[in-house]
Design a protein with these regions (language model features):
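A glycine- and small-residue-enriched flexible loop/hinge signal that marks low-structured segments
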Residues: 2-23, 29-48, 52-56, 60, ...
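Short gly/ser-rich anion-binding loops that grip negatively charged ligand groups
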Residues: 70
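Hydrophobic alpha-helical segments
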Residues: 383-390, 419-423
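C-terminal edge-of-domain segments
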Residues: 402-434
Length: 434
């Protein structure tokens, strides 16, 4: 069972855990966890089915053919290349599993998918021992495995095929055929969400254009952020979500064979990898897609007001206009500062790190007395001090954190004030000319 978490309005929670609210300051109107972790459900021609699988940036560059069916520099991998421009680790899930595996007389593809049809088996007599055969597996034009055996039963499955108990015979190349991708529907998306709920990551991205699927992911994001205390941001394409946890990408890509929503790959990676003391504002788009930036100045202003994460062209270079989320409606406790993704990175860092600290070090272990609360206070101060040293917050002092006993003997109430530092975004300059 997961520990309790999320926000609170009164001290009446039943599950043990950390419940944390972030509110705006009144106005006129232990260790920090790493970033760079993203998750995405993907439509693939090859790969693991029915499970979340972890891929690091290094894995992608070295093992892309084995993992995804194409070399990392293939045009088919532009999206994932964009993602790994910013992300260090991806928790991937294949949406279109459940299809047919390609096969021939000698072997069956390891995974379903149309890419399995590019496998072939070459069998030759061994030059040194004619009683044996050299059995070679090709993936496209790439030789991926060779084994020398006397009979098929001696063959060992490799990363691409499993072998059948067939009589070996010389062949210049017998292709595998019949591989198909599975279908993608709401059930596939829900299966991914069910699997990924227990993982920890900074951003989730989904490359879809229909509002029904987008709203499924928004509901998931809101439930985990607000009810379970699992802080992450969701990146979608062209949706007015009006929520700090959702980033809505305005621009489309114009590349043939790709969804117009494909910029979600790059934004998901960039936001996951952006340091807690940094911003993506004015960040150069260094990905592989052609971005539609055909907007007037007035349209760009309107996009900011609408909470749209927008790219624009500056001196021929595509850059991020503002590092904002989709939130547009403000209140006394949730002001304009929460529209900025740098603010969300800071509060998500605090929310996640405070919860991990409490749930792993204090929950059920440390007594709720003056000494125990002082220890918790000290650890909370350390986390905020580290953020201040990084330049993510400013003006923090020890007195900005208080830890007190709650309404019950087991409850602890923490009050914490922070001031988030945001990157420079506007320059107002007056020049006096003599």
């Amino acid at each position: 069972m997961a520990l309790g978490g999320g926000t609170f309005t009164s001290q009446n929670k039943e599950l043990p855990g950390a419940y944390i609210n972030f509110v705006s300051a009144a106005s006129a109107s232990a260790a920090l966890s790493d970033r760079g972790i993203a998750t995405m459900p993907l439509e693939l021609d090859w790969g693991v089915e029915g499970e979340v699988f972890e891929v690091t940036n290094e894995d992608f560059q070295k093992n892309s053919l084995k993992l995804f069916g194409y070399a990392f520099d293939s045009p088919k991998m532009i999206g994932l290349n964009d993602l790994f421009m910013g992300a260090k680790t991806l928790y991937a899930y294949r949406l279109n599993g459940g299809g047919d595996k390609a096969a021939n007389t000698y072997a069956t593809a390891k995974y379903c998918g149309v890419r399995g049809n590019d496998l072939k088996i070459v069998i030759q007599k061994n030059a040194d021992d004619t009683s044996k055969y050299d059995v070679t597996t090709y993936f496209g034009t790439v030789k991926v495995d060779t084994q020398t055996v006397a009979k098929a039963a001696d063959l060992v499955a490799n990363d691409y095929v499993t072998f059948k108990a067939a009589d070996l015979a010389v062949t210049a190349g017998t292709p595998l055929t019949g591989g198909t991708n599975g279908t993608v529907d709401g059930t596939a998306h829900q299966a991914y969400l069910d699997k990924i709920e227990s993982y920890t990551y900074n951003t989730m991205g989904v490359v879809v254009t229909d509002d029904v699927t987008k709203k499924l992911y928004v509901a998931f994001n809101k439930r985990l952020r607000d009810e379970l205390g699992i802080k992450f941001q969701l990146v979608v394409y062209n949706l007015s979500a009006d929520y700090m946890g959702v980033i809505s990408v305005k621009n489309k890509v114009t590349d043939t064979g790709w969804s117009e929503a494909a910029l979600v790959y790059w934004v998901t990676g960039a936001e996951s990898g952006c340091a807690v003391n940094k911003s993506c504002q004015n960040k150069k788009y260094d990905g592989g897609f052609t971005v539609d930036t055909n907007y007037t100045q007035n349209e760009l202003k309107a996009a900011i007001k609408a909470g749209e994460f927008t790219f624009h062209k500056v001196n021929g270079v595509v850059r991020v206009l503002e590092d904002i989320n989709s939130m547009v409606t403000t209140s006394d406790t949730c002001g304009d500062v929460f529209k900025d993704n740098q603010t969300i990175r800071v509060i998500d860092q605090l929310g996640n790190d405070d919860a991990v600290l409490f749930n792993t070090k204090y929950l059920g272990v440390v007594p709720n007395n003056a000494s125990g609360r002082t220890s918790l206070w000290s650890d909370l101060v350390k986390i905020r001090t580290q953020l201040q040293e990084l330049g993510a917050i400013e003006g923090f002092t020890d007195s900005d954190v208080t830890v007190a006993q709650g309404d019950s003997k087991k409850a602890v109430v923490i009050t914490s004030a922070i001031t988030v530092v945001n990157a420079m975004g506007k320059l107002y300059e007056t020049v006096t000319v003599a």
